[in-house]
Amino acid sequence: MTRRWFRARLALAAALALTVTPAARAAQPPLIPRDVLLGNPSKTQPRISPDGTRIAYLAPSDKGVLNVWVRTIGANDDKMVTADNHRGIRQFLWAESGKHLIYLQDVGGNENFHAYRVDLGDGSVKDLTPFEGVRAQNILTDPGHPGEMLVGLNRRDKKIFDMYRINLDTGEAKLDTENPGDVSSWDTDADFVIRACTAANPEDGSQILRVRDAAEQPWRDLVTWPAEENGDLEGFAPDGQSLYVETSVGADVARLVRVDAATGKELETIASDPRCDAGDALFNRTTHRLEAVTFNYTRREWKVLDPSLKADFDALGKAHPGDVDVLSRDHDGGKWTVAYSVDDGPVQFAVYNRSGRALTPLFVNQPALEKVQLAKMAAVVITSRDGLKMVSYLTTPAGMEARSLPLVLLVHGGPWGRDVWGYNSQVQWLANRGYAVLQVNFRASTGFGKKFLHAGDRQWGGTMQNDLTDAVQWAIQRGVADPRHIAIMGGSYGGYATLAGLAFTPQLYACGVDIVGPSNLKTLLEATPPYWATMRKMLYLRMGDVDKDSLFNRKVSPYFHADQVRAPLLVGQGANDPRVNIRESTGMVEAMRARGLPVEYVVYKDEGHGFARPENRLDFYGRAEGFLAKYLGGRAEPFAAVEGATADLR
């Protein structure tokens, strides 16, 4: 893309935009085309080969479909090694031998992922898990066993995943460890033997850390985390006699600790932060030593545990602005791929060489973003009406005063997830169109301790929704938001919150955009995939037992309150969504239309829980852009149905 062509395109987009005031037009930067912000990245997710000589990364083919490419470090010999022509590839890893790449792919968004092996010698591709209706997950590899991988498959029983050991040269798969019926994840020791797992108690929702001393030895329960605690397994220590776990027992936040593999006794606290839970742990792939861990309250921070790496993280922190993430490392740990995320620019990827502490840029995720002005994201802490501190992020349009702006409350999914600081294509798209964007880590968001998490138990449509209302009022009271022009928007749980916001606080919002959001909690849980079975008790504890308590379900499900909606609604849905069945969206739309309420509905026949294909993504967001401009008054790039999209207007 040339600079001249890009500027001409921006000028055309700005000239054709919906009418805005002369003052606003003069102050705001030109419209950034939707396909720059919301289309496929130019290049992303570089992963270094085990020997440190090559990187594999994702980039579009000449047909615009994301595929895996390989490049020799220091050369320009980039070669596409996969040949997907439809949904694109998003998950891949190197085999430890360096001879193969492994990638995951489903069909039409059904999330029954198959694991494929690409032979980098002859280019052949083999489906390693060629079983109809079976999902591959929990892939494990180990440098000491370069010709193998372990993978979980629900082949024997659709509700649970047994672990299979696959020979990557022949494709032969053998059952390694059978699931007794309650295990949700597995892990190996330094000898690549499955010796630990986490299981769910279906009676009380507790989580169990289970271990065994060898492959032929019986399993035994080591640690039990009650449902009100947070706990997770990170991995074995190198000697196999202790394990690293994250646990909130004895504290509010989850600490990273080491426990005895024989007794479960806590041996030492490795790292903790009083503000937030421990995050990603960084292990040496060859020695299995724990070397660093992240914490993220408002921004990502690294706590270095291996003194020999302190100078490396110091060098990375000084080399480039933004928050740094370590994406991959070679076997000897000498070369890394890293990513720098800033709030107002593209993601920068680089290779870091510990020898000389040299950082060599690779590419950015979208070069066109280097030529435009993006908006800044500010971390703010908002206090709810009952005193909870909610880490939130406010982004206001570049070139405009942050006063009386139309605002989009962008609600994250999960709800057991969180928003983070850094580049966000959806946020930048909205800000470029003239909207302030508010992202709130409401109660039940993860990473802020067990009290904050469990304050959201049974509070869908209750205090969780109040948190969002309080955040909007915060923005209004500070003069940032125009109270007449507030929208609520989100996907998955964020879609539910959109429906709940319009139904339960109809006076607050001018419009809403719901993407794959559930409208009836009972029917949502009735239609979940069979492999969610081990999570069912946890879902009841956190959401409420909507199967037994029909009055509670009617209270919190927007479907039963469709008559209260007053603001226009746009709904986007994937026809094959395995998590939120299409009936959730169709039911809400029909309930609103039966009452003569304004709703637009678009279904994409080859999508699941979200819009993976760029044609569908650009089609939906083009419709959403016009919808928001109509009801909030922001700018919009002209829209016509996108060629190749499978939109079905209903």
Residue ranges and their predicted role:
Residues 1-6:
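N-terminal secretory signal peptides that target proteins for export/translocation
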Residues 9-21:
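Bacterial N-terminal signal peptides
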Residues 22-26:
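Sec/Tat signal peptide C-region and signal peptidase I cleavage site
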Residues 35-66, 335-337:
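Beta-strand-rich domains and repeat architectures in extracellular enzymes and scaffolds
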Residues 40-41, 63-68, 84-90, 96-391, ...:
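Peripheral, non-catalytic segments that deliver or gate enzyme domains
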Residues 57-83:
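Beta-propeller domains
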Residues 365-492, 497, 526-536:
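Cap/lid segment of the alpha/beta-hydrolase catalytic domain
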Residues 442-650:
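Active-site-proximal cap/loop segments of hydrolase catalytic domains
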